[in-house]
């Protein structure tokens, strides 16, 4: 296994499972957002779908990304170069997944702002900016885990303040959306989402600098996290209300420190559960396939968006429950088969 920078790292089955499950949850939530009719979206099924596509997805991707960035020994220039490439790749993906829609805009069939779709602040653009920022912070903070942890808290805490501050002359709205703000095309801005990268980064450094923590057996961890699980379960209604409301100053995309804290508690509890699954069932064939999905997360993320994004031009908010289920299986199978084909072509 290699990290984002080509450094050799021993394959982590738990991380692969986390990412694999996240991809599956991600596909269904994108279908719920794009395809499903408003009445289904507003139902308990819709709220459940959005919750599964909330803390189980983006925070997992970003925290795992931060965790493995802490392994990297690459210089700043590599972080900057990789960050720029990822950011530009995100813009290219925005364009490609909206190709059907953009063609109709060009043809005059739809009167929409094309930049809304091309300059959407999504996960890939966030990953690129996160690499840039992390590369710079590594020079200043070195391996001081507490500085990354405090920075994560600050990023999450000031996000609502930045959103309320609104526009500045330095950053026009289309570009400010990548950093902060509640514009409709600002899905994953740096504030607050970079906080999860920093949380994962600091978590890895804490473990590295506290060998005792790594030696705690899974049974002891389960006992420690029983109160955390209880707290997470009791407060699911609070979290679900946020994950079901995507936009606006109090929505999922622009949440503040309270939801960030809840997600961290959830991630730690969820990590213990997935670690337990890996220890007891890690050799299972189905879970092995989920791990493969996790290993190919970036490629599968791109493929599923190319499929869903272009179909959404025709199917936007028009599908019922059974159609949603059908589309989930179809898109998931198509994504995986395409990924297998691409993987085979890429092999020497």
Language model region names:
Residues 1-348:
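Alpha-helical transmembrane segments and their immediate juxtamembrane cytosolic regions
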């Amino acid at each position: 296994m290699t990290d984002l920078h080509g450094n050799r790292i021993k394959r982590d089955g738990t991380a692969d499972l986390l990412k694999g499950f996240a991809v599956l949850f991600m596909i269904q939530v994108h279908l719920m957002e794009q395809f499903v009719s408003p009445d289904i979206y507003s139902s308990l099924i819709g709220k459940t779908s959005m919750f599964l596509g909330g803390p189980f997805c983006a925070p997992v991707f970003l925290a795992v990304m931060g965790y493995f960035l802490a392994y990297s020994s690459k210089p700043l220039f590599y972080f900057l170069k990789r960050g720029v490439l990822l950011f530009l790749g995100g813009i290219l993906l925005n364009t490609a997944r909206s190709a059907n829609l953009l063609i109709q805009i060009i043809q005059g069939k739809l009167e929409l702002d094309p930049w809304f779709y091309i300059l959407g602040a999504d996960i890939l653009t966030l990953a690129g900016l996160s690499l840039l920022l992390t590369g710079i912070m590594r020079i200043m903070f070195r391996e001081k885990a507490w500085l990354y942890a405090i920075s994560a808290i600050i990023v999450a805490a000031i996000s609502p303040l930045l959103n309320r501050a609104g526009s500045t002359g330095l950053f026009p709205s289309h570009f400010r959306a990548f950093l902060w703000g509640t514009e409709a095309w600002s899905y994953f801005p740096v504030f607050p989402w970079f906080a999860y990268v920093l949380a994962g980064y600091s978590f890895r450094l804490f473990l590295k600098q506290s060998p005792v923590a790594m030696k705690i057996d899974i049974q002891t961890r389960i006992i420690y996290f029983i109160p955390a699980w209880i707290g997470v379960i009791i407060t699911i209604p609070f979290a679900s209300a946020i994950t079901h409301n995507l936009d606006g100053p109090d929505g999922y995309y622009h949440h503040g420190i309270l939801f960030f804290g809840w997600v961290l508690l959830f991630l730690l509890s969820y990590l213990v559960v997935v670690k337990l699954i890996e220890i007891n069932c890690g050799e299972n064939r189905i879970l092995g396939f989920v791990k493969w999905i996790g290993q190919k997360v970036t490629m599968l993320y791109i493929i599923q968006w190319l499929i869903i994004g272009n179909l959404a031009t025709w199917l936007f908010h028009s599908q019922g429950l059974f159609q949603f289920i059908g589309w989930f299986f179809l898109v998931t199978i198509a994504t995986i088969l395409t990924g297998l084909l691409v993987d085979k072509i890429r092999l020497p």
